[in-house]
Every structure is written in structure tokens, then in C-alpha cells.
């Protein structure tokens, strides 16, 4: 059979969209969780981290329930946008975003917590409001962690299989991303197609991990306040 | 003019501060853990006292009785941190300019980065990053940055403790000069009694949150 590159394009689309969603949502949530104390914080923290430990099939099942034809958000989408989520690329994006979110969240939260609080205090004594402190001090100094989180989230989105299969299905040319294409090509005995995709995914994942490790060892910007 | 009388509960003791200062340098001296930094942080608004009142230039910035707690950014207090707390992601000049009041908000002095940098002899460092300058230079940048906000009170937390003896003596002299020039009250925390004697117009000894002695000196300028 002829090699199809469409799963690669679909995977890249899904991963990119998922990373944008994850970045926009995880940074404010991580900042809030790192900086504020509130009642029930531990419960919220556990819910946020849950997709990291739940089997993909459980996440897929939950997403189907919420975004399905009769699910609360599924109905809303139908009503507002006259479109459905299940068995579309949007479903694959949602599945990827949900599994990638905790990785990005953890990385950003740790990075924000590691910013020297004296620097933030110093900015306040210099007249800065909280938003200015966040955008001029906290965020730039947490940048290393944020970039690491983005790369991990992208890689995780690219590799998402179980939940994606359940909510977006296996529609070649429409929702069939790389991991799903590998599974079904292998099932159908098309080892040629499967092998090429396997090699691409493996090389890419290796490069991500290698790049992160190298970067972690590189000259890091000093996040301390220039202390002696 | 600073008038403050407040208490703050700490894990092992209760801190009580009773400070009155119109001009000159007040040296807060005492061993580690005596509560010196806590006093500065309460004055600046970085910590909240459990009881009391703080007035700066006749303006009430904290009162437990009336529920007043003016945010840090509106207290007009300069703060020099023990480890300088220079922003590592900004050049010396950007650090110094960070707290410059917006045009028109403070009409009494015309301050530019250039003359503050010059006053503290750090013009040549303006494009460097904090990790590219020495401890003494960091201290000058931290001072310049705090003064740039045109504070009505300057708090210095162990500003000279991490410096070598030579740099320390030079900076001690410069602090005295700076105070004479600037004419605002300075509160300086130190664990070194000699430094307190040398710099303080007034000395408060602190031990486990209690003020043990207040001495007013008349320093020969």
C-alpha cells in the first residue's frame, strides 16, 4: 500500500491546537495555585493532576459522556455552533489537551514557585501592581519551566492514543492521527506504513527528550536576586 | 517623619516595635532571629502587624484599630533587601528605572536615571546584568533603584553584611553622605554593633522581639 503522510499532518494540527489551549489555560491556573491559598485547594490540585494517572480509556469515556450527543457540553456545541465534537478533529484536540494539561501545569507551577519571592517583594516595594509583578518578574523568570512544559505537552499531545480513539474515532484523512494510524495499519498487516510512522514518532520523541536534557544542562539564567 | 508602634506575633515570641524618627539614620541592631527584618517588613507592608499603628509623614499607613492597611506600592518606602533582590532578567539601568514614578505624580524632585547612576558611581554599569557585577556594585544598584522611587523613608536590611571590609567602609561613608543629601529618614538593620555606632544617629537594640535600649547619639559630621 502507498504511504500516507496525512496522519502526520493531522497529528501536528492536533498537537499544535492542544498546546495553544493548554498554554492559555495552564499558565493562569498554575500561577493561581502557586500564589494563592484557598479552601479546597488540595481537591482542585488533585482533579487537575488526575489525567496524569487515569487510564486513557477512562478519560475517553468521560469525554464521550461530556461531549457526546446528549452530554452537557455536546448539546451546547450543537446548539451554538451547529457542530458536534465526537468523531471530529476537535474531539482529538480536546482529548490531547486534557492529557497534556497536567504535564504543562506541573512544569509551570514548579517554575513559578521557584522564582525568588524577594524579587517579587522588591517589585512591590518599587510600586508595581500584582499584574506588573507577574508579567515583568515572575513570568520571565519562570520561562525555562514554561518552555519545558510546552515541549512536553506538545510531545504528549502528539502521542495521545486511547482517549483520542474513543472520542474522535479512526476516520482516515479526518481523525486518524499518527498513533491511531500505526495501530490500525499494524492490525491490517500494513507493516510498511506502520514502520515509517513508528520511526518518525520515535525519532521525534527522542529529539524532544534529548533536547530538554541538553537544555537543562546548559547555562541557565540566574533566577536569584544577584545575591553574593 | 516616621512614628510606629506595633506588635507582631512570631512563632516563638511576640515582637514589639516602638519607633520615632524624623531624620537621620536609625540603626536596628541585634542577633539573628531578633526580629529586625520583621520590623522592616511590617513598616514596608510586606508583613502585617497583629496590632498597632504606623504613620509616615503624618499619613496613617497601618492601623489595627481602624482597619487601615495601605498597599506596599502606595507607602512610598524604599527597601534595600539583604541579598539586593536585583532583577536578574534586566540590565542595571532597567533595574534602576523599574520604580521610577510616572511623570507628574511626584512633582518635588527631578530625578533621572542618569543622575542617580552618577551619584552612586555606577553609570558605567548601566548595560550590564546583575550577575556581571560585584557585590559592592550590586549594593549601589539596589540603593539607586530604591532611591529612584523618591521614597519618604528608606529601609536597609543588612545592606553591607555580604561585602568585604574595604568595600564596606567605603559604602558606610557613602550611606552617611547619601542620607545627608537626601534628607529622609533611613532605618538600617545590622548585626554589627560597631556598624550601628558608626552609622546610627539613633540605635535600637533588639533581642527576641524586645527593644532593649534606645540611644540617641549626636554624630559629628
Segments (PLM) and residue ranges:
Chain A
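Membrane-cytosol interface at the C-terminal ends of specific transmembrane alpha-helices
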Residues: 84-124, 137, 149-150, 210
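Non-cytoplasmic
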Residues: 68-69, 146-184
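Transmembrane alpha-helices
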Residues: 20, 105-108, 116, 130-163
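Membrane-interfacial helix termini and adjacent extracytoplasmic/periplasmic loops
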Residues: 60-97, 168-171
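C-terminal transmembrane helix and the adjacent membrane-cytosol boundary/short C-terminal tail
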Residues: 109-125, 137, 191, 195-228
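Transmembrane-helix boundary motif in ABC transporter permease subunits
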Residues: 17-48, 61, 111-113, 119, ...
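Interhelical loop and adjacent transmembrane-helix boundary motif
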Residues: 1-6, 166-206, 210
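Periplasmic/extracellular loop-to-transmembrane helix junction in inner-membrane transport proteins
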Residues: 1-20, 35-41, 77-82, 185-191
Amino acid at each position: 500500500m502507498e504511504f500516507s503522510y496525512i496522519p502526520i499532518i493531522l497529528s501536528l494540527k492536533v498537537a499544535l491546537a492542544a498546546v495553544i489551549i493548554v498554554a492559555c489555560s495552564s499558565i493562569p491556573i498554575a500561577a493561581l495555585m502557586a500564589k494563592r491559598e484557598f479552601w479546597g485547594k488540595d481537591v482542585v490540585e488533585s482533579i487537575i493532576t488526575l489525567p496524569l494517572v487515569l487510564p486513557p480509556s477512562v478519560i475517553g469515556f468521560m469525554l464521550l459522556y461530556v461531549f457526546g450527543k446528549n452530554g452537557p457540553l455536546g448539546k451546547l456545541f450543537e446548539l451554538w455552533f451547529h457542530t458536534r465534537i465526537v468523531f471530529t478533529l476537535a474531539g482529538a484536540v480536546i482529548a490531547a489537551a486534557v492529557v497534556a494539561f497536567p504535564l504543562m501545569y506541573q512544569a509551570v507551577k514548579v517554575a513559578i514557585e521557584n522564582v525568588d519571592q524577594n524579587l517579587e517583594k522588591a517589585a512591590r516595594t518599587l510600586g508595581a501592581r500584582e499584574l506588573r509583578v507577574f508579567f515583568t518578574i515572575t513570568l520571565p523568570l519562570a520561562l525555562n519551566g514554561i518552555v519545558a512544559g510546552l515541549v512536553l505537552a506538545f510531545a504528549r499531545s502528539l502521542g495521545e492514543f486511547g482517549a483520542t480513539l474513543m472520542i474522535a474515532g479512526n476516520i482516515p484523512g479526518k481523525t486518524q492521527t499518527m498513533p491511531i494510524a500505526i495501530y490500525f495499519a499494524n492490525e491490517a498487516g500494513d507493516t510498511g506504513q506502520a514502520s515509517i510512522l513508528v520511526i518518525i514518532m520515535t525519532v521525534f520523541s527522542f529529539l524532544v527528550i534529548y533536547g530538554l536534557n541538553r537544555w537543562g544542562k546548559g547555562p541557565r539564567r540566574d533566577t536569584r536576586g544577584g545575591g553574593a | 517623619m516616621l512614628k510606629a508602634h506595633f506588635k507582631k506575633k512570631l512563632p516563638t515570641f511576640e515582637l514589639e516595635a516602638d519607633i520615632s524618627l524624623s531624620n537621620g539614620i536609625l540603626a536596628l541592631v541585634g542577633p539573628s532571629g531578633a526580629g529586625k527584618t520583621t520590623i522592616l517588613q511590617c513598616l514596608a507592608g510586606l508583613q502585617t502587624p497583629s496590632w498597632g499603628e504606623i504613620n509616615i509623614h503624618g499619613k496613617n499607613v497601618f492601623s489595627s484599630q481602624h482597619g487601615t492597611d495601605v498597599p506596599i506600592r502606595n507607602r512610598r518606602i524604599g527597601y534595600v533587601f539583604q541579598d539586593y533582590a536585583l532583577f536578574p532578567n534586566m540590565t542595571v539601568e532597567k533595574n534602576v528605572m523599574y520604580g521610577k514614578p510616572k511623570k507628574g505624580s511626584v512633582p518635588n524632585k527631578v530625578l533621572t536615571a542618569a543622575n542617580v547612576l552618577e551619584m552612586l558611581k555606577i553609570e558605567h554599569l548601566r548595560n550590564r546584568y546583575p550577575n556581571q557585577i560585584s557585590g559592592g556594585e550590586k549594593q549601589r544598584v539596589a540603593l539607586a533603584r530604591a532611591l529612584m522611587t523618591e521614597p519618604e523613608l528608606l529601609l536597609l536590611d543588612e545592606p553591607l553584611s555580604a561585602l568585604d571590609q574595604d568595600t564596606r567602609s567605603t559604602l558606610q561613608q557613602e550611606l552617611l553622605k547619601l542620607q545627608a543629601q537626601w534628607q529622609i529618614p533611613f532605618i538600617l538593620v545590622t548585626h554589627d554593633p560597631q556598624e550601628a555606632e558608626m552609622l546610627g544617629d539613633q540605635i535600637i537594640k533588639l533581642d527576641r522581639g524586645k527593644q532593649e535600649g534606645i540611644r540617641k547619639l549626636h554624630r559629628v559630621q
